[in-house]
Amino acid sequence: MEIFPIPAESYTLGFIGAGKMAESIARGAVRSGVLPPSRIRTAVHFNLARRGAFESFGVTVLPSNDDVVRESDVVVLSVKPQLVKDVVSKLTPLLTKHKLLVSVAAGTKLKDLQEWAGNDRFIRVMPNTPAAVGQAASVMSLGGSATEEDGNIIAQLFGSIGKIWKAEEKYFDAITGLSGSGPAYVYLAIEALADGGVAAGLPRDLSLSLASQTVLGAASMVSQTGKHPGQLKDDVTSPGGTTITGIHELENGGFRGTLMNAVVAAAKRSRELS
């Protein structure tokens, strides 16, 4: 079957599923100017709060998922993994190769999505929760009939909520363990830093503010300077000083190995669940 190009300058975007991730993507697209809200639609069946969230920035809320697919050139599946097969199977007659299909459902492989949809013009994307503040780390993998132009459209769309990379799907379990679950590891680290500040005598609100800004600043140093984190660490570590003393304690506690083990364990669990 002939693959029809998606009109990059005028395509319509539909979300199957109206949860927080779909909202984050839609808001990012509107905020960045990638798409006007008039070209975005979703369906909300019962939850009035979700309907209100989308309508608050101009997205069209339609009566059914069927309507969303009919009116959309690009269809994003943003439903819980256990519901994907049922949802896709019901929409199969409408999922022609005129449509570019995108899945953000965790753990659902392209081969299954393509089989259920009867369409291999699919792109799988793994975003993470900082999409809500425009700082997602997303990775995409293209299915059998997805074109380079399709990939460019999705890269621009997900670029509106952070940064996006392309990778083979075989890496997605490891990506889940790192960037998918990673925000929770960092939240734990921020909480621990703040608790350490309190233990050292700081007021709780000041300690938490300093901890979160310190992590944000350190991450920005890595991404913006291009320096290896080990070099940046060495740059602020003086002989016999406070920082090397703190690092010594972290090394004694197995800090590096514990973080590495967390990523590996989460990746293993992702493989078990997919």
From Swiss-Prot:
One of its GO terms (biological process) is L-proline biosynthetic process. Its main location: cytoplasm. This is Pyrroline-5-carboxylate reductase. It catalyses: L-proline + NADP(+) = (S)-1-pyrroline-5-carboxylate + NADPH + 2 H(+); L-proline + NAD(+) = (S)-1-pyrroline-5-carboxylate + NADH + 2 H(+). Expressed in all plant tissues, but mostly in nodules. It comes from the Eukaryota. Signal peptide: none annotated. Belongs to the pyrroline-5-carboxylate reductase family. Gene3D superfamilies: NAD(P)-binding Rossmann-like Domain (3.40.50.720), ProC C-terminal domain-like (1.10.3730.10). Its EC number is 1.5.1.2. Pathway: Amino-acid biosynthesis; L-proline biosynthesis; L-proline from L-glutamate 5-semialdehyde: step 1/1. HAMAP family: P5C_reductase. It comes from Glycine max. GO terms for cellular component: cytoplasm. It is an enzyme of class 1 (oxidoreductase). Pfam families: F420_oxidored, P5CR_dimer. PROSITE patterns: P5CR (PS00521). The keyword GTP-binding does not apply. NCBIfam families: proC. GO terms for molecular function: pyrroline-5-carboxylate reductase activity. InterPro entries: 6-PGluconate_DH-like_C_sf, NAD(P)-bd_dom_sf, P5C_Rdtase_cat_N, P5CR-like_CS, P5CR_dimer, Pyrroline-COOH_reductase.
